[in-house]
Amino acid sequence: MQYNILKKSFYAQQSLDVAEKLLGKKLLFNKHQGIITETEAYIGHDDPAAHSSHGYTKRTSVMFGDPGFSYVYFIYGMYHCLNVVTEPRGFPAAVLIRGIVLLLEDQPNIIINGPGKLCKILHITKEHNNIDMTQNYNFCICNTGINIHNYICTPRIGISRGKEKFWRFVVSDLTFLQHLKLENKVYSI
C-alpha cells in the first residue's frame, strides 16, 4: 500500500504550526488508524516543560535529530507517550500526540483522549522510539484532506512547569469524526 505520508519538510516547520496542522491528520500504526484530535508542542531549551530543557541526554537525543522521527518515552512508571520530532535538526522540539478518534471497521469509532491511553490501546512502547515516521508505512502520519477549523488552544496539561503557554491544540467538535470509516484503500501520493 502507498500512503500520502507527511514528509520531513512538514515536520521541519515551527512546532506550533506543526501541532496545529496535525489536527485532522491520520496516525497509522500497524493495523490501527486514527484521526488526530489533540496535540501539544514542546519547544527548545527554554521550555521548562520540555525534556530538552535539561540539555542533550541519551533520552532526549532523538529530539535533537531529524524532524519526523518518533519520540516515545515512559512516564509515571506506567504510561508511554508518543511525540513526533519537529523543527530543523539540532533544535530540540517535538509535538505530543494527546488524542485521536480511532477508526473501527464494524463498530463505532472510539475517542481516545490522553497520550498514555493512546499508546496503551495502540500498543506503542519505547521500542517504537526513534523511528523515521516519514519512511515507515506501518508507523506514520498521513494527509486526509480533512481541514480542521474548529479547534481551541489551551494551556498544556499534566505538567508542573510551563503551564502558562497555550501550546495545546484540541479539536472542539468531534461529531463529524465519529462517523468516518476505516479506509483500506490505497492513498495517492
From Swiss-Prot:
It comes from the Bacteria. It is an enzyme of class 3 (hydrolase). GO terms for biological process: base-excision repair. Keywords: DNA damage, DNA repair, Hydrolase. One of its GO terms (molecular function) is alkylbase DNA N-glycosylase activity. CDD domains: AAG. Belongs to the DNA glycosylase MPG family. This is Putative 3-methyladenine DNA glycosylase.
